[in-house]
Swiss-Prot record:
Identification of the protein by name: Phospho-N-acetylmuramoyl-pentapeptide-transferase
Domain of life: Bacteria
Native source species: Caulobacter sp. (strain K31)
Gene Ontology CC terms, in alphabetical order: plasma membrane
Family classification: Belongs to the glycosyltransferase 4 family. MraY subfamily.
Family annotation (InterPro entries): Glycosyl_transferase_4, PNAcMuramoyl-5peptid_Trfase, PNAcMuramoyl-5peptid_Trfase_CS
Length: 371
């Protein structure tokens, strides 16, 4: 919205108005969206948590077959803390992003839609006091429909460059120089799998205090930089990246994700006063997945978000192996609970997973030069 004001003033010949002139700089708007999102999330935190406690009563149900100490330590903790993140994310993005940018609206649309889906899941769990909310099939069908619509919108309406003809339906491979495969309209399915899959991967990771949100912020930082670089024709040319017109604006959204995440972590730090819930995890995973699709770095997301991928794979492997043999590979899935069963303290698991996520973000950035 503030960018609209700057745009209106600049068209009227008033582009040099102090302070507002700063809005033409993407880096400034990214920083301001981060700060704004943080302030919004922190400011609403205490009252929102008290309200959630009053409304939810017993709070988020804890798995009875899980880690024994969690049943005692985490009982009564409210969920739906994702609302705090999303409030900051949307306020920061709407204030400082260019709202004429189709990439911004696609990412915000995915984020909001998945947030609503997550809220419905959290609401069902809290009201029924069960760890089973919406069925997996219900969530997946909704996620795929939304993701398919988003992919179609990008293919049809996203700005195109004469030098990137066909890029909107192509998969760009990292490291392997100039290896690009045009999937045609099959790309819609690929994009939907990327968005929905990563959304669920983040959801599965959100099982310990602070575990998911910090890796989400690492990934958002990485993809904010990637979006900034591939959206700038000079930087893209220098780094031999495929230029994606106008996608740099997503750096502002990534800044808002980071700021909202920091504000939420203020209250989610151990011992957590509130859980993110599916309201936050499904939305943030969808946001990162859609940003990767917009920036044409879907495969790099598998590296940067490798921690989330590993968590999801551990569940898939556990379920498949158990169905076939009646035995379990891991003591408990997702894999962070496996390490708890091995005797690792919760804080040890969380911090070590943060380290892994940070290193994977660096590896993902390194692929920009390994071409």
């Amino acid at each position: 919205m503030l960018y609209f004001l700057y745009d209106w003033l600049s068209r009227g010949g008033h582009e040099h108005v102090p302070v507002l002139n700063l809005l033409k700089y993407l880096t400034f708007r990214t920083g301001m969206s981060m700060l704004t999102a943080y302030v919004v999330a922190v400011a609403m935190g205490s009252r929102f948590i008290r309200w959630m406690k009053a409304k939810q009563g017993k709070g988020q149900p804890i798995r009875a077959d899980g880690i024994a100490r969690h049943v005692v330590e985490k009982a009564g903790t409210p969920t739906m803390g994702g609302f705090m993140i999303l409030a900051g994310l949307f306020v920061g993005s709407l204030l400082f992003a260019d709202l004429k940018n189709v990439h911004v609206w696609v990412v915000l649309g995915i984020t909001g839609s998945f947030g609503v889906l997550g809220f419905m899941d959290d609401y069902a769990k809290v009201t029924k006091q069960t760890t089973a909310g919406l069925s997996s099939s219900q969530k997946l069908i909704a996620q795929f429909i939304i993701s398919i619509l988003a992919a179609v919108v990008l293919i049809i309406f996203a700005p195109k460059s004469p030098t990137t003809v066909g890029l909107e339906t192509s998969v760009v491979f990292p490291i392997l120089k100039n290896l690009v495969i045009n999937l045609g309209w099959f790309y819609v399915a690929f994009a939907a799998i990327t968005i929905a899959g990563f959304s669920n991967a983040v959801n599965l990771t959100d099982g310990l205090d602070g575990l998911a949100i910090v890796p989400v912020m690492f990934a958002a930082s990485t993809f904010g930089l990637i979006a900034y670089l591939v959206g700038n024709v000079k930087f893209a040319d220098y780094l031999n990246l495929h230029y994606v017109p106008s996608v740099g604006e997503l750096a502002v959204v990534c800044g808002a994700i980071i700021g909202g995440g920091m504000g939420f972590l203020w209250y989610n730090a151990p011992p957590a006063k509130i859980f993110m819930g599916d309201t936050g995890s499904l939305a943030l995973g969808g946001a990162l997945g859609s940003i990767a699709v917009c920036a044409k770095h879907e495969l790099v997301l598998g590296i940067v978000g490798g921690l989330f991928v590993a968590e999801a794979l551990s569940v898939m492997i556990q379920v498949a192996y158990f169905k076939k043999t009646g035995k379990r590979i891991f003591l408990m899935a997702p894999i962070h609970h496996h390490f708890e069963k091995l005797g690792w303290a919760e804080s040890t698991v969380v911090i070590r997973f943060w380290i892994v996520a940070m290193m994977l973000s660096f590896v993902g950035l390194a692929t920009l030069k390994l071409r």
